[in-house]
Amino acid sequence: MASNQKIIYVYESFRSTTPNYLGTLFVENVRGRESYSFEYDADWLKSSANYMYLDPDLQLYAGRQYPSGAKNVFGLFADSSPDRWGRLLMTRRERILAEQEGRKPRKLLDSDFLLGVYDETRMGAIRFKLDKDGPFLSDDSETPTPPWTSLRTLEEASRQFENDESGLEQKWINQLIKPGSSLGGARPKATVLDTKGNLWIAKFPSKHDDVNVGAWEKVTHDLARLCGLDVPESMLIDFSKYGSTFLVRRFDRNGAARIHFASAMTMLGKTDGASAADGSSYLELVSFIKANGAAPKRDLTELWKRIVFNMAVSDTDDHMRNHGFILKADGWHLSPLYDVNPVPEGDELSLCVNEDDATISLDLALEIAPYCEISTKDAAAMAADVLKTVRDNWNRLAAECGLSRSAQEYMRPAFSLALE
């Protein structure tokens, strides 16, 4: 049986700006199918004896460890890998190279995608090398992260890339592959650097959009801020007639310092696609915060208000990848809110609210308030405040984002819970 092994050296940069060797990731390739195992570095374990675990499949002990159940790769490394947009860019680039070199395109495996992400903009604080004395991967010192002034060019590149069905436009790939490969999701996007050295995610219009998605995400983002929820800095810019570009500041960076981020999918031991259909529930997030949160009271209140807010705007894409945690010196904290969008025909969330029901229903949210250590009286008051804030401001914010009256009427059903 044909087999070969790839050894990847894993580092973390969340305890200091100096990278610390975390351990070794072993990737076994048997007839084009990869399997993974990981072993912590002994010195890292000694220095981290009382540290929080980074993945439920990677407990803090010596020796090889393997993903559990049907998982092929540890969630810790899945969070560092690109999602659909980044994978599409890498796959298209391989096709171009194969065409130029007169060969068949190589099938890219999970480890290729993992190592293909540009290190400078990689999400979180986990980093990778193939040689301990070599660079962190992927490395490209000749072309730094694009500056803010390149946004218009990047939006044009993303549009040309989407419209290029043959996949042979080399120049668009070159402009997008590095700033876009580090990010999750399916939408065209890129990471850019502002004049103060802060990283931002730019989400561009897509040819598949039926509405101005960027403008509506900005509306929802600002509504969340008005409701007192934790959201990063954001802005909206129009570069073309095709739609708005929504920009949000990366919360996994503090200047040059990296902050470790883990999705709820990883920390709850879930696989991609986990949803209400398999019983995945907000109550699991509640349990994780109670057991592992550094500020459980604050985070439980924030999480519960997010449930009500998601209902108020009919955000039906609130799956486990769209919830996350950041690791600080004192432990795990609920990450800022991200990727919230209104859906006019939405009537169920992606996750169950209680154990088995995902219906957009204020009664359901109130039912689980005690699990979040919120009294019935306080929950009713908080819910009323969220709904009133959405009801009183969604039209105004939509107009400020340049959305027409007809666009607002089309999206009105998304806010029906608040408008009742």
Regions found by a protein language model. Give the residues of each.
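Phosphate/dinucleotide-binding and metal-coordinating scaffold of catalytic cores
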Residues: 1-320, 324-420
